[in-house]
Structures are given as C-alpha cells and as structure tokens.
C-alpha cells in the first residue's frame, strides 16, 4: 500500500473556546458528547492498560475543563494552555495517544508502575500492510 492519507487536524484557537458562563450552561451536553466520542477512541490492551487516541475535540474539552476548574479568563493564560495542549492534537502525519495504566489499589499500583518502567519502549502499533510504528514517548 503506497497511498498516503493526510488529514491535518485543526489546532485550537482562542476563538474556539467558550466563555466560562457559556461553557457552564452547555457543559452537560458537551460532556455527554465527549464521553460518547471518547468511547470510539479507546483501545483496551488488557484489564489495566488502555490506549486513548487524542484529537481536537478531546483536547478542546480538556482545555475547557481546565479553564472551568481554574477559572482562567485572561487571554495570556489561555494562550499558554493552547501552547501546552495543541501539540497533543495529531497533525496528519502522526497519532497522539495517551497510554493509561490503571491499578485501583495503591500498593499494587506502586509495584506495577515500578515493574513497568520503560514499557513505552516495548509497544508498537501495526496496521495491516505497514511496518510497525513505535512511540516517541513523553514528546510533550
């Protein structure tokens, strides 16, 4: 397969963010939509590991939740958040994935995370007909 598909995802701009008041009013609907959307972007790897594929919609939601929690209104602070979150949106030449390891029991979590140090070097994604792709971990 030699054909390349390039789909550049839009980056989040200040104009894409809602005011605190508007977000609060729309939050229940937005939250339900994002929960439904995120279900289609998760790949479980076992009982304790999941891949979450990031995109514009997910990152915009995360920024809006941060703005809500921290009551951020100044454009300068908002721009700082955009600078932090926009690199987590795929640019059409890559995937952005959060690898979640979840262990509810604190003692087990500490032990497992110690044992799993470096696991990001052992993971790859392979699509039929293509070579495996290995992550660039902690790029952000």
Predicted regions and their residues:
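Short, extreme N-terminal leader segments that mark the start of a protein/domain
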Residues: 1-36
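A glycine-rich, hydrophobic loop/mini-helix early in the fold
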Residues: 48, 53-96
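Long, charge-patterned amphipathic alpha-helical coiled-coil/hairpin "stalk" segments used as oligomerization
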Residues: 83-92, 96-140
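Short amphipathic alpha-helical segments
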Residues: 26, 55-58, 108
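Generic amphipathic alpha-helical segments used as scaffolds and interaction surfaces in large
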Residues: 14, 21, 50, 100-103
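Catalytic core of tubulin tyrosine ligase-like
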Residues: 39-41, 45
């Amino acid at each position: 397969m030699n054909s390349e598909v390039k789909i550049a995802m839009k980056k989040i701009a200040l104009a894409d963010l809602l005011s605190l008041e508007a977000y609060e009013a729309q939050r229940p609907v937005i939250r339900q939509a994002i929960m439904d959307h995120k279900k289609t972007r998760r790949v479980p790897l076992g009982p304790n590991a999941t891949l979450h594929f990031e995109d514009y919609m997910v990152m915009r939601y995360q920024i809006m939740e941060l703005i809500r929690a921290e009551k951020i209104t100044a454009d300068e602070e908002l721009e700082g958040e955009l600078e932090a979150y926009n690199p987590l949106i795929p640019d059409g030449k890559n995937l952005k994935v959060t690898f979640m390891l979840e262990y509810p029991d604190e003692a087990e979590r500490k032990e497992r995370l110690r044992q799993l140090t470096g696991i990001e070097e052992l993971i790859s994604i392979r699509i039929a007909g293509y070579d495996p792709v290995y992550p660039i971990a902690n790029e952000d």
